[in-house]
């Protein structure tokens, strides 16, 4: 059989009753094998204990102690079908566990192969899994080192500790497995269109892969019994890996198990085919989910909390009043916003702690608090927020290095710690923490001009320290002793978390100049491109410490992947953006978009229907050995995505930014949700890694975006604050906007506008009603206020 489009071809051949299935792509003008599977592609694993029998009308099989080979499906027949102009190739298989029909059709428009598998079991509980297992045609190489591996690119949401591990639907943030060798790219994406909570409870979708050396890599998609390691705990060795289980998948009597998936097969730039996967997931799933979830920022603890302004009241008054402590220190009026974490990780510390670290960054929280105080004219708030800045400026400095955590002692004294013991080493200065704190010190120059000279001095000392300590290849060691020596072997020669230092150096140069600082930032950026990107070794503290500890030399030989965490990616995406803004070098924008796209693989493209009480669309997970949803790093990347949109006009960036912003509020009061992928195991870490983190992003983004955002440079419009834009048109001097607001949201909304021609005048219509005529200059400067009476409702169910 053969199916063919302009860029994709599907072939089946039969030799002595054995099926060979091949998917080919047009590559360099020639047809090249992308997937080639010998034997029937569908495979089933028997459940160890089966019930039923002839009394239920099923064929009795007796003892199901069958080997995998004995459970294989034999080819029964192949057929071509044509209906309404669409050709479908069908293959029929039969085996002791049941019968299967596979349907393949090619989509010329999307350049995708759609596959549907229907399996009728011989008995209702005789399988532990049913899946299609497809082999990547290019042969793998031998693993050599961190630069050269079996394939040019491999990606899955989770990696393995044991061969039986897989990727369950609980980890489907971006449900895809991808391979690339040279320009040959292949990916499998499960079809989630029918995957509601009822379907997933009965038929647990899963993905799997294997990448053996000097052989053929494979990926699979189907129904797989399994889940979180039952021995896994946050502190345990099993966190978070997902083994297959022996539990049978129960099918209704004479029932049929159905699952579908898409294959993305194409010629792509080397190591960049993943970007097709990223965009496909959003186009196919994420965009639709965003349009259907107008109130994702509504929190189940209080349904009235939906407007970002309502959240601001909760955060900046109630929560900050609870968590703020003022204290005198070194002749300054200082303050802290407690995270209540340090007493758990550093013996002798109190719960009155101030964190200046990559997660609980009090300086960032206080910055957003001060922004709120300034825009509302509340001077008391602004002064209290400035107390957090004063504490950092008063911290003990050592050749430019400074500590990350303070503890307010019970006698009123202050004790500083260079790092915590949860994800660092208490007595050593940590580069990533200092870089992130330094970046936020620089932001405070905009709000606190009277302290700007002191801020600049502290930041210059830190910048000089980084320049001095930088390795020849651009990497900056992670940890330094009190004598400012990089003695710790871990992360000394290689790490990706130095991206935070690159961000700080680029921002310092952008504000204050200094060729040495630009050169150092670019040197670190080049290191990330040359040494990290080839095999995506995004090594940072979370990948090996924190709640998923593992040896620093851990390598997953089953999938040929390294541990990686997205915090280093988030800092890198931001750093490359600032480098471009500071120097105008298009290369940094190009590489920054590449890294930004890669981070999007850890963003949820759907509201998982089995996650209870919380919307998950837009939320970020952390790494490939953890499982949380809606972790607050999504608040960091939301601002960066908005900035990339404003530079590029890529609508996906803005939609993802809005989804990420909303997800931070859905997670309240936790630092993330469903920590191990499944429901439960949630933690509260305080305002600095929680609702405050989200509200700071809102304070940064809403002055740009308003409740609705229109960009006339790109002729695009977006709903932001519990609003959905249904359509937008720019016709000569008229702007037509169709929008709806969530139930419970105010009707008087602000539209922010960018890119209007300042010499033009525009007539604005909202839901068919004229809103007035405005000059382009007026729209750019202050936008306009409109009334949106139309109400939109959620189109998705969130389980209680």
For each of these PLM feature ranges, what is it?
Residues 6-36, 41-52, 469-473, 580, ...:
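Short beta-strand segments and strand-loop junctions that repeat across beta-rich extracellular domains
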Residues 30-264:
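Beta-strand/loop-rich accessory regions of lumenal/periplasmic or secreted enzymes
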Residues 32, 769-774:
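Surface-exposed loop/edge segments in extracytoplasmic proteins
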């Amino acid at each position: 059989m053969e199916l063919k489009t302009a860029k994709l071809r599907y072939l089946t051949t039969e030799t002595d009753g054995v099926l060979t299935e091949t998917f080919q792509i047009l590559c360099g003008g020639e047809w090249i094998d992308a997937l080639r599977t010998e034997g029937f592609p569908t495979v089933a694993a028997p459940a160890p204990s089966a019930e039923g029998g002839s009394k239920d009308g099923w064929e009795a099989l007796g003892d199901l102690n069958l080997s995998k080979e004995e459970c294989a499906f034999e080819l029964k027949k192949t057929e071509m079908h044509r209906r309404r102009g669409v050709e479908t190739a069908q293959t029929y298989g039969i085996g002791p566990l049941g019968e299967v029909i596979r349907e393949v059709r090619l989509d010329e428009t999307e350049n995708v192969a759609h596959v549907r598998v229907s399996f009728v079991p011989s008995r209702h509980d005789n399988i532990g899994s049913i899946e299609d297992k497809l082999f990547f045609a290019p042969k793998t190489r031998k693993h050599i080192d961190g630069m050269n591996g079996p394939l040019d690119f491999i990606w899955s949401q989770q990696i393995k500790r044991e061969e039986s591990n897989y990727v369950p639907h609980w980890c489907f943030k971006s449900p895809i497995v991808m391979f690339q060798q040279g320009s040959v790219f292949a990916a499998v994406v499960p079809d989630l269109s029918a995957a509601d909570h009822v379907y997933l409870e009965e038929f647990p979708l899963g993905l799997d892969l294997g990448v053996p050396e000097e052989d053929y890599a494979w990926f699979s998609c189907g129904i797989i019994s399994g889940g979180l390691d039952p021995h896994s705990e946050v502190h345990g060795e099993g966190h978070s890996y997902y083994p297959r289980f022996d539990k049978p998948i129960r099918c209704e009597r004479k029932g049929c198990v159905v699952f579908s998936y898409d294959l993305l097969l194409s010629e792509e730039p080397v190591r960049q085919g993943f970007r097709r996967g990223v965009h496909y997931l959003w186009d196919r799933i994420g965009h639709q989910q965003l349009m259907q979830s107008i109130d994702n920022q509504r929190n189940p603890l209080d349904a009235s909390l939906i407007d970002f302004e309502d959240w601001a009241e909760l955060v900046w008054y109630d929560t900050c009043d609870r968590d703020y402590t003022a204290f005198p220190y070194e002749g300054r009026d200082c303050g802290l916003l407690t995270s209540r974490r340090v007493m758990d990780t550093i013996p002798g510390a109190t719960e009155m702690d101030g964190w200046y670290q990559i997660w609980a960054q009090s300086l960032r929280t206080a910055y957003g608090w001060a922004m709120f105080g300034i825009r509302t004219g509340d001077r008391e708030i602004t002064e209290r927020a400035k107390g957090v800045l004063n504490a950092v400026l008063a911290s003990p400095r050592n050749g430019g290095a400074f500590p990350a955590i303070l503890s307010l002692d019970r006698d009123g004294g202050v004790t500083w710690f260079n790092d915590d013991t949860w994800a660092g080493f208490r007595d050593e200065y940590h580069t990533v923490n200092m870089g992130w704190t330094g970046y936020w010190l620089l932001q405070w120059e905009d709000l606190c001009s009277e302290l700007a000279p002191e801020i600049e001095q502290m930041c210059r000392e830190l910048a000089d320290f980084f320049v001095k300590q930088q390795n020849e290849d651009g990497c900056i060691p992670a940890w330094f002793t009190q004598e400012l020596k990089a003695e710790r072997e871990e992360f000394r020669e290689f790490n990706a978390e130095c991206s935070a230092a690159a961000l700080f150096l680029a921002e310092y140069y952008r504000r204050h100049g200094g060729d040495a600082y630009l050169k150092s930032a670019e040197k670190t950026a080049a290191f990330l491109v040359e040494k990290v990107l080839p095999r995506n070794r995004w090594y940072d503290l979370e990948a090996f410490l924190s709640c998923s500890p593992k040896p620093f030399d851990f390598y997953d030989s089953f999938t040929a992947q390294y541990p990686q965490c997205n915090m280093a990616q988030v800092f890198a995406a931001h750093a490359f953006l600032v480098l471009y803004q500071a120097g105008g070098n298009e290369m940094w924008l190009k590489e920054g978009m590449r890294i930004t796209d890669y981070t999007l693989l850890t963003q949820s493209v759907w509201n998982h229907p089995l996650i209870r009480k919380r919307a998950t669309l837009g939320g970020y997970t952390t790494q490939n050995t953890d499982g949380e949803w809606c972790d607050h790093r999504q608040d960091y990347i939301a601002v960066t995505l908005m900035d990339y949109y404003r530079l590029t006009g890529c609508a996906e960036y803005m939609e993802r930014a809005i989804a990420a912003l909303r997800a931070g509020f859905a997670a309240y009061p936790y630092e993330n949700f469903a920590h191990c992928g499944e429901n439960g195991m949630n933690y509260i870490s305080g305002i600095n890694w929680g609702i405050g983190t989200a509200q700071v992003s809102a304070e940064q983004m809403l002055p740009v975006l308003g409740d609705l955002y229109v960009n006339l440079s790109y002729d695009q419009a977006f709903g932001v604050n519990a609003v959905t834009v249904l359509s937008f048109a720019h016709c000569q001097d008229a702007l037509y906007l169709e929008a709806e607001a969530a139930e419970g949201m105010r009707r008087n909304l602000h539209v922010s506008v960018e890119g209007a021609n300042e010499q033009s005048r525009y007539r604005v219509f909202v839901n068919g009603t004229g809103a007035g005529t405005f000059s382009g200059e007026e729209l750019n400067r202050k936008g306009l206020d409109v009334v949106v009476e139309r109400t939109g409702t959620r189109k998705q169910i969130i389980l209680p």
